[in-house]
Amino acid sequence: MKDFFKNVAATIVGLFAFGLIMTILGFICIIGMVASSNSKPALKDNAVMVMKLQGQIEDRTEDNWLGELTGEQFNNIGMNRILSSIRKAKNEDKVKGIYLETGILETDYATLQEIRNALADFKKSGKWIIAYGDALSQGGYYLASVANKVYVNPEGNVDWHGIASQPQYIKDVAAKFGVHFTVVKVGKYKSYTETYTEDKMSDANREQVSRYIGGLWLQMLGDVSKSRNISKDSLNRYADGLMVFDDTKLLKSRKMVDGFCYYDEIRDVVKKQLGLKADDTINQVDYNDVDMTIDDSNLMGEEIAVYYCQGSIVRMETPSIYDSEQQIVSTKVIKDLQELADNSQVKAVVLRINSGGGDAYASEQIWRAVKELNKKKPVVVSMGGMAASGAYYMSMGDQYIMAHPTTLTGSIGIFGALPDFSDLMTKKLGFKYDEVKTNRNSTYASAGMSRPWSAEEIATMQNYVNRGYSLFRNRVAEGRKMSTEQVEKIAQGRVWLGTDAKKIKLIDGFGGLSDAIDKAAELAHLSSYQAVEYPALAGWMEQLLDMAGGNKGTYLDEQLRLALGDLYQPFIMIRNMKEKEPIQAALPYVLNIQ
């Protein structure tokens, strides 16, 4: 019997050792694959940079190694990498032009505009851009239209339909499950809560949405009209007529494209542009590899920190196994900004913000950290597709603010959506509750679960929101050098397009991320400088450990995006409903711009 237990123990130890060895070998294989994928050939002369863009474009993204290994990756593209590659290709003599291929792009119009402006700047160097698509989405065509030549498949199409917003309302759906909502808010334009309490747009919401989507469309019309030499009236007529279903041949006569070719034939077009013969090989470099193949002579001088803030503003990180949405975690951001303030090597900071806001308390704490940072060194805010409500709040520390004409900003207001699940719990599911308490409001924490919200609780929450709005308004007045009366006229939760925001002094100037970096250098009196990105991105090992601990939902989130399509955003909205802090300084609704 003793020998039996020895053999069992030896077997267990052997199996454990074998498993450990296989795990180590697996990690070595992964490291090898990552290392081999990072090994890029030297750039050859007479080269073309290939840009194939499809998927979701964000300001900055982590490399998703798990998706790459499984081959089931939903493309998340970093705008910072796109802009860097275009700039480097412009300054590299070996790169003669760009081949641009666009598919379905999921991003905001300000991001598209920033990339488009970078491509236009690339052309100013005398280099060319050739764009191609089997079928071009509206966003894809907006990018492609800046090219010298645009080609489409002979049986392809161009989707050009204008812009629409279709908010979703869940009041009746929620009521079927015994769920109701009570709203406390300040601001007639603060219409986020309409999603839960109404079945259509309010007049105020319709007014602001009409204003800014009309402004977005005018920007697109102007840019495409100038690049393609097509009148705005013609472009509007094409959008009205469901051009995506028209005969493809009409695209050339309408000057939307320059020609037609199949995918294999576009190579011949590029060869001709490079002066190559039919049997010559094209020297090409993928835009993702440019950082490793082109030396950047601009990486010298004093350091300007570019700190990225993307996603919802929260007090503490709220991880999920199936949602990879980025978050602006106030505790982490404050710590990072304090470190940048104390870092003598950092001479200025660019705060890159792309957020619809979030927790009001967290926004106030970040506001103070930014203000304290600005006392030690210049801070410039660079607004992406949106920097609204809480994201605008945190920008009010007296610093210079830059945005795009198509940025959505403002939304100075606060709301609270108080969900009431008591009918679901007691009438639908049959839960029973009883209580013993020492004071009148001892059970306030269970309001909306065991019982409806009381009139006293609702009134107290409304007073709380009123104080928060007053503080928000005062922060804006102080930061923008305005009176509270002036702020009130442009507040009330209203969302403003960048073009209007500059007129009413919510921002200081127009420009993209590179312009903001240049402005920070100017304010810091720097003649030579380099931009360094913060916070540091997680490596593959950190991503693995996070996923093992249930702290990242990147992979499962990608599967949800692919499976749900247009239903993804409503699903996430409903799932997050109960997790949010009750008082929010957030964009007045979930954006749904088509």
Give a label for each model feature.
Residues 308-311, 353-355, 383-385, 405-407, ...:
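Active-site proximal loops enriched in glycine and acidic residues that flank catalytic Cys/His/Asp
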Residues 3-39, 46:
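Hydrophobic alpha-helical transmembrane signal-anchor segments
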